[in-house]
Amino acid sequence: MRKVLVVVLVLLCLASIYIFIPNQIMVSEVEEVESSERIIAKYLNSNENRQKWWPSSKQILDSTGLQSSVLDYEGYKFDFRNSNYNFNEVLIINNSLKINSIITWDLSTKNLIRIRWKVSIPTSYNPVTRVFQYLRAHRLKSHMALIMESFLGFIVNSKNVYGFHFEREIVQDTILATSNTISTSYPKTLEVYNRINSIKKYLREQGANQVNPAMLNISKSEQGAFQLIIAVPINRIIPPVQGILINRMVPGNIVVAQIKGGPHSVAKGFNQMNLYLKDFKLVSPAMPFQSLITDRVDEPDTSKWITKIYYPIF
């Protein structure tokens, strides 16, 4: 009777192995992230860029000494190959395991990208081997999840992608005393601060207070003239005067970044902010501007300047 019971239990165990472990084990990771297809492709399809977010610090070089398409993680090798704009084939190697996986990505909603990483692992008819293959598939899924987490954690940080930390905020300064002048040459720092000081003088006369650093926008027309717009945030409405207007801002959304450095650094920040707006399909209803945190007259060393840059969005 005991022998019969043992045989029955063994048969049940074997049957359960074949019932619960399929002939093809599907391993997949599916995530959604607020990003763009351009960013996903840039950091998945480039050997150099993959090194920036890969969770293991170990690098594999090819025969020429360049960064290889093969990356190592916990004893598994991942060989990225046959990539295009929204598709990447990854060969996964671990001892006897050598199998292709597929990473795809597409637009889920306006700024939400769905990323899928899938692999199908065939199993053996040998029950012991089948169990080991199931355990290895479970371990592989865990590794894929951690790799995906590392990738997503990297690309959602704007500092990693654009070189600057961008924040979306609500406009706080809604009352501005503004000045608009045109010149044939690029406005010098002293000219800018002369205009700022003229506005401040008028504020004192009217008993109004400046509540934040002065704002600046310089643009060049097709004819080559430079338009200098200065805006000083103030605490209340005051009468306009010749050369100084009082404008009301809608408390809408705005993208903000803090820049350290001179005009070149600020221009680079605006270029990257433009790319950020394009990636996330954001539209600007108004001109961008700088907030002069550092007094540029008192601090002639441009490398020490701190400037906040802003882009209104909706």
Where on the chain are the PLM-derived regions?
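Hydrophobic membrane-insertion alpha-helices, especially the h-region
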Residues: 4-20
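A solvent-exposed interaction/effector surface
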Residues: 16-21, 37, 41-48, 55-66, ...
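Alpha-helical transmembrane signal-anchor/signal-peptide segments
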Residues: 24-39
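Generic structural detector for well-ordered beta-strands
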Residues: 30-34, 79, 104-106
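A structural signal for short, hydrophobic beta-strand segments that form beta-sheets
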Residues: 60-63, 77-82
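N-terminal post-signal-peptidase region of extra-cytosolic proteins
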Residues: 74-76, 87-92, 98-103
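Ser/Thr- and Asn-enriched, surface-exposed coil loops between beta-strands
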Residues: 83-89, 111
